[in-house]
């Protein structure tokens, strides 16, 4: 399977350009650094064709807080990657690498209380949106 060029955003560190195999198994392993078990990788849309790949259950696995993305504290290591119009993973362009390296350059620190409160806020907001349907 092909490899794609992505940005790795680890807790407490600056972003690093790296390669990932473009498979579900590789994605699951990549987002499970520090977890007891292999997690389930999921994506969160940042922009039109830019996504983050992260461990949805990172909070439950007590992974450390990393960065805040669209109002949600992401726990554990996550990756920034591109997607084609057909939603297939693709490499970031040099411009995208520069842009997202700058965006996530400064490490952020969160307490367990911050992470739990944020998780509850995100859950509440999701429930409010569901009620509107």
Where are the language model's segments positioned?
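Short beta-rich binding modules
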Residues: 1-133
């Amino acid at each position: 399977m092909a490899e794609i060029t992505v940005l790795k955003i680890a807790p407490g560190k600056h972003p690093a350009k790296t390669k990932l195999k473009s498979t579900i198994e590789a994605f699951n392993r990549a987002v499970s650094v520090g977890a007891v078990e292999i997690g389930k990788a999921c994506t969160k849309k940042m922009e039109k064709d830019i996504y983050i790949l992260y461990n949805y259950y990172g909070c439950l696995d007590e992974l450390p807080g990393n960065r805040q993305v669209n109002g949600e504290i992401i726990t554990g290591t996550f990756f920034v990657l591109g997607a084609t119009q057909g939603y297939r993973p693709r490499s970031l362009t040099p411009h995208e690498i520069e842009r997202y390296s700058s965006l996530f350059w400064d490490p952020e620190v969160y307490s367990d209380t911050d992470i739990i409160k944020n998780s509850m806020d995100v859950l509440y907001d999701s429930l409010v949106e569901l009620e509107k349907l």
